[in-house]
UniProtKB/Swiss-Prot annotation:
EC number(s) stated in the UniProt entry for this protein: 1.-.-.-
Annotated protein name in UniProt: Putative NAD(P)H nitroreductase YfhC
GO MF annotation terms: oxidoreductase activity
Organism, as annotated: Bacillus subtilis (strain 168)
SUPFAM superfamilies: FMN-dependent nitroreductase-like
InterPro entries assigned: NAD(P)H_nitroreductase, Nitroreductase, Nitroreductase-like, YdjA-like
Length: 194
């Protein structure tokens, strides 16, 4: 490949990385599962020590699937915050109801701590690849985490095995609005040469 093309491709990639935003407000149309699958086929080329490919995915975008997810997440919220009012719980459910699709990223937890760390890092790299590919296609995502990722009842609701857990819950759809770029610390302030 000629050097000028390499520079141009680098510039396109740099622009995608710098412009990508976490999207929290979506249009109602879900992203077709074929588009999600296509992006995952490319995203899977994330660095992965020993090529274990520890991941699998659950895409929830049907009305029935979303209703089950919302009820499962609401039950978890009520259990983890017993003083949550019915009004706050309903607001939580309404917020989830406005999300057109959820991609649940699952990975196998190796018994070996180092292998487990490697696999989680690989899965996280895949997720970032996916977010960049989505942004390039005009698809928005927000990567969610928290205590819900570790809850055994939530695991059971989605058919996770004993050696699996969630790496992320990714809300996905076509952006209704994108937030402004947030100021980032110059990397020189966090860079040491030895």
């Amino acid at each position: 490949m000629p050097q000028t093309e390499q520079i141009h491709q680098h510039s396109v990639l740099r622009d995608i990385i710098r412009s990508r935003r976490s999207i929290r407000k979506f249009k109602q149309e879900p992203v077709p599962s074929a588009v999600i699958l296509d992006m995952l086929e490319t995203a899977k080329y994330a660095p992965n020590h020993r090529v274990t490919e520890p991941w699998r995915f659950i895409y929830v975008s049907s009305e029935t699937g979303k209703a089950n997810l919302i009820n499962t997440f609401a039950a978890f919220s009520k259990k983890s915050k017993p003083d949550m009012t019915e009004e706050k719980l309903q607001n939580f459910k309404n917020t989830l109801g406005r999300v057109p699709g959820f991609l649940l990223v699952v990975f196998q937890e190796d018994e070996n701590e180092r292998a487990r760390d490697d696999d989680f890092a690989a899965t996280s790299s895949l997720i970032q690849n996916l977010q960049l590919l989505a942004w390039e296609k005009g698809i928005g995502m927000v990567w969610k985490s928290g205590k819900i990722l570790y809850d055994k009842e939530v695991h059971q609701a989605f058919g996770l095995q004993d050696n699996e857990r969630f790496a992320a819950i990714i809300q996905t759809g076509y952006p209704d609005e994108a937030p402004e770029v947030k100021k980032r610390t110059p990397i020189r302030d966090r860079f040491t040469e030895m």
